[in-house]
């Protein structure tokens, strides 16, 4: 479960950076 959370966190960070 933790691994999945990390992936979501990475995507979220990238989304913010693009915004």
Swiss-Prot record:
Keywords, in A-Z order: Alpha-amylase inhibitor
Gene Ontology molecular function: any one: alpha-amylase inhibitor activity
Function: Inhibits insect alpha-amylases.
Protein name, per record: Alpha-amylase inhibitor DR3
């Amino acid at each position: 479960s933790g691994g999945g959370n990390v992936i979501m966190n990475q995507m979220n960070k990238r989304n913010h950076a693009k915004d």
